[in-house]
Amino acid sequence: MDVVEYVLDNGKTLGIDPARVAIGGDSAGGNMAAAISLRLQKKLALQLVLVPVLQIQNWQTIGFMENTLYLNKSINSLDSIVFLTNYLNLPPEYAYQFLLNNHTSSSFKKSKYLDSVDQRKWMPRKYVRTKELWDNLDHKKDFGNEELFRKIEGHLKEPLISPLIADDETLGGLPFTYIMTCGFDFIRDDGIMFHEKLKHLKVDTELAHYPEGFHNALMFPHGPLKMDIGVKIVADIVRILKNKL
């Protein structure tokens, strides 16, 4: 945050136009970019939010359940949740509680915070491959580890950790937002729901969804592991930067 503010405040010294500053990142970096944009709003020209994790309230999304079947020994590994427990300063054994959505209390599951990640409201059916998951989308709400919830309640209510739960006024002040998601990514739905929410609030936003893509696909635009999907993703990002900055 301090670095971005310094760049914006010292454009002349740095030889850049502060009106043309963009921020972006992928995965956890996408989360960071979105969080910084929540604070700086339209001081930024645009944000690139690529295969982002944008909420920690619901780990039983359709995308999570669909895609842990694939690449689950690498980028879609359930062990990835340990990164989250480390970030929250929790022992790794709590990761399993998150996977079951047992980290939130029964009352929290019925609160406005879960409305922000309600897939009936924010997840278009066209992105879902598995009809059975869509048909059985409604989750039980009468359970939860109250002790764990009390430990992390502040984190669960913090939009700088979960930008998807930010209030409408804050989200409505965001700059142009380019969101990239991949069909075989277990955090796929976060970016799609973010796009739908911004659209609802009349924020200028574009979603680039690659049904055949996976979480790190943008890392393969060249070299011995070059993939067509990697080339396409990077080309689309370049197009956005050229057209919007």
Regions found by a protein language model. Give the residues of each.
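Alpha/beta-hydrolase superfamily serine-hydrolase fold, recognizing
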Residues: 1-245
